[in-house]
Every structure is written in structure tokens, then in C-alpha cells.
Swiss-Prot record:
Cofactor(s) required, per the database record: FMNH2
Database matches in Pfam families: Chorismate_synt
Enzyme class, UniProt record, top EC level: lyase
Positions with a binding annotation for FMN: 131-133, 243-244, 287, 302-306, 328
Protein name: Chorismate synthase
Family: Belongs to the chorismate synthase family.
Binding site for NADP(+): 48, 54
Enzyme Commission (EC) number: 4.2.3.5
Catalytic activity: 5-O-(1-carboxyvinyl)-3-phosphoshikimate = chorismate + phosphate
Highest taxon, organism lineage: Bacteria
HAMAP family cross-referenced by the UniProt entry: Chorismate_synth (MF_00300)
Length: 361
């Protein structure tokens, strides 16, 4: 196995490298007769697309998606719909600058997958990182746009809630604010602070990490599975598969270790439309199965390892040397990871929805 596929019923296989001709994915398991136009996928891709502000990589990629298979005009309406067969999506790479990486061809970047790819395969694609580049995540976003079409009534949203040691004020959370700043930040005041803060990081040639929060509202109670098919286990695996992610928590997460049983357990009351929870420390999942509350997942993204300051390393021959990375890189890769996290949430939920239908109807 080469481990380029995730999902069970809703399966996504991605392909391509950062500096290759193109990247893409094949989505298998999508039900038939779901309306799907390239423009619907493009909306999500444009949110992740690089070069839209000085706070992301200046690599200029239009990320125009092409649907190669799995769709046709509906015989009744004429609208383009899915056929139930594999959907192949292609995104061409148009702004590669492989020469920027020639000086590190034989050197390993500290904190990067260079060393481990070399250890596993005996070589690695130094040109932009190959498959280990965040460029690959554009394909996940494209797949996530299809997954959203399956999730009728479910709203998946994400936000950047921390950059470096600086956290947002949750009392000022405004979902509408996210579209007004380049950080996907729901706190207007903190977004203004991040602008100056990240400018300083960027101008110094360094980078910084971040924490992102992804939520899903409208997920029906009962979605998921116990033990080895847990919804939260699959969500954690999906988020950990994103480049640069080093930690995942659901609901109260690690803070639950500081709570008593009385504080942590989400008490329940009867309501007109079913059961009402008085809190959501569980993050919308108990025993691997959705409670019907909002699902809340947070993940930590490490600082970009390709930075402009000299670092000590070794080369392929094992000789000690110094490395300074050129090229165009995100000073905070967490910014563009918000749409990626949303996509992975959508893909996992779509997969579990189809599995749920297969088991209980």
C-alpha cells in the first residue's frame, strides 16, 4: 500500500507533486444525481489558493479545477450531476520555480519531511517538497467540496483561534468576520493584531505556528460507530494527515484532564425537539458516535520549516553543513489550513453518513 487513499465508502485518492505538471484526486463512492459544477468546487479552492495576501506564499497558482469524469447532464433536467462512478479532478501547476531549491538538493531541511522521505524511499523530491508539500492539500479541498454536497443540512466551518502564543477572545467570536480578514480569524481585534505580529515574523524570515478550530453543526445524533470505527478517531486521523499538523483535540480535549467528573460531563435535559445538553465538553461525540451537538475539532499546526535563517543540518552523505532555504513559503501555514481542515471534516462526515446508511438504513 502507498497510503494515498482515505475513507471507506466515500474514498479519496490524491496524486501529484508540488512541482509536477499537475495535482489531482479521484473521489469514489459519491452517490449519483447530485448536482455538481466546477464553480461549486472552485469556491472552496479559491479560499485556500496561495498568493492572495502578503501573509501567504507568493506562488501564483490559479487552482482552476477540471472535472474529468463521473458527471453527465441529468436526462430529466439537463443540469450536470454525478453518475455514481469515480469523479476525477485535475488542478494544473503553473508557477513552479524548481531552481529556487537547487541549493538544498542534497541537504535536509530541519523540521521537514526531507530526511524521513529519504530514509524510507532512498530519495526525495526536493523541488518544493513533492508529496509532502502543502500543495497537495488543494486536492483535499476539491474533494471536500463534493463531500459538502452529500451533507445536506450540515454546516462545516473553520477559524484560526491562535497564532503563536496569542489566542483570540472567544467573547468576540463573529463568524462573519472570518471573510473580512486574511487570517480566517473570528475576532476583529485579534485579526488586526495578527497583521502586525505576522508582518514582523515574515520580515525576519521566520515562521510561526497556529491552532485552528473546525466545527460541524447539524450532524444527526447516531452518526459514527463504536470502538474501531469511531467518528472522533477518524476525524483525528484526518486532521493529523494534514501537512504540519502536530496535535488534535476534540471538545474540551486536553483541558478535560483538568476537570472533575461533575465539570466535564455534559448534563442533559428534555426539550421539545428531543434532548438538550447543558454544555459540550464532548465536542459532539460520545463513544465514537455523534450526539447531535456541534462537532468541535481543534488542531495545532507547526511553524513552516522552510525559513530564511541559517540552520545546522546534514547532507545526504552525512556531512554536517548549514542550510538556508530560498523559495516562496507561508510565514504561517495555519492560515490556509482552515479550508483544508473544513474539507477533511466534510470528507469524514460524508464517509460516515454513507456507512451509517449502509448499516441502519
Amino acid at each position: 500500500m502507498s497510503f494515498n487513499t482515505f475513507g471507506h465508502m466515500f474514498r479519496v485518492t490524491t496524486f501529484g507533486e508540488s512541482h509536477g505538471v499537475a495535482i489531482g484526486c479521484v473521489v469514489d463512492g459519491c452517490p449519483p444525481r447530485i448536482p455538481l459544477e466546477p464553480a461549486e468546487i472552485q469556491v472552496d479552492l479559491d479560499r485556500r489558493r496561495p498568493g492572495q495576501s502578503r501573509f501567504t506564499t507568493q506562488r501564483q497558482e490559479p487552482d482552476q479545477v477540471k472535472i474529468l469524469s463521473g458527471v453527465m447532464p441529468d436526462p430529466d433536467t439537463g443540469a450536470q450531476v454525478t453518475t455514481g462512478t469515480p469523479i476525477a479532478l485535475l488542478i494544473e501547476n503553473t508557477d513552479q520555480r524548481s531552481k529556487d531549491y537547487s541549493e538544498i538538493k542534497d541537504k535536509f531541511r530541519p523540521g521537514h519531511a526531507d530526511f524521513t522521505y529519504e530514509a524510507k524511499y532512498g530519495l526525495r523530491d526536493y523541488r518544493g517538497g513533492g508529496r509532502s508539500s502543502a500543495r497537495e492539500t488543494a486536492t483535499r479541498v476539491a474533494a471536500g467540496a463534493i463531500a459538502r454536497k452529500i451533507l445536506a443540512g450540515v454546516k462545516v466551518r473553520g477559524a484560526l483561534v491562535q497564532m503563536g502564543p496569542h489566542k483570540i477572545d472567544r467573547a468576540k467570536w463573529d463568524w462573519d468576520e472570518i471573510a473580512r480578514n486574511p487570517f480566517f480569524c473570528p475576532d476583529k481585534d485579534k485579526a488586526a493584531f495578527f497583521e502586525d505580529y505576522l508582518d514582523g515574523i515574515r520580515k525576519s524570515g521566520s515562521s510561526i505556528g497556529a491552532v485552528l478550530e473546525i466545527t460541524a453543526e447539524g450532524v444527526p445524533a447516531g452518526l459514527g460507530a463504536p470502538l474501531y470505527g469511531k467518528l472522533d478517531a477518524d476525524l483525528a486521523a484526518a486532521m493529523m494527515s494534514i501537512n504540519a499538523v502536530k496535535g488534535v483535540e476534540i471538545g474540551a480535549g486536553f483541558a478535560a484532564a483538568e476537570l472533575t467528573g461533575e465539570e466535564n460531563a455534559d448534563e442533559m435535559r428534555s426539550a421539545n425537539d428531543g434532548t438538550r445538553f447543558l454544555s459540550n465538553n464532548a465536542g459532539g461525540i460520545l463513544g465514537g458516535i455523534a450526539t447531535g451537538q456541534p462537532i468541535v475539532v481543534r488542531f495545532a499546526v507547526k511553524p513552516t520549516s522552510s525559513i530564511l535563517t541559517p540552520r545546522q543540518t546534514v547532507d545526504r552523505a552525512g556531512h554536517e553543513t548549514e542550510i538556508l532555504t530560498k523559495g516562496r513559503h507561508d510565514p504561517c501555514v495555519g492560515i490556509r489550513a482552515v479550508p483544508v481542515g473544513e474539507a477533511m471534516m466534510a470528507c469524514v462526515l460524508a464517509d460516515h453518513l454513507l456507512r451509517h446508511r449502509g448499516q441502519v438504513g
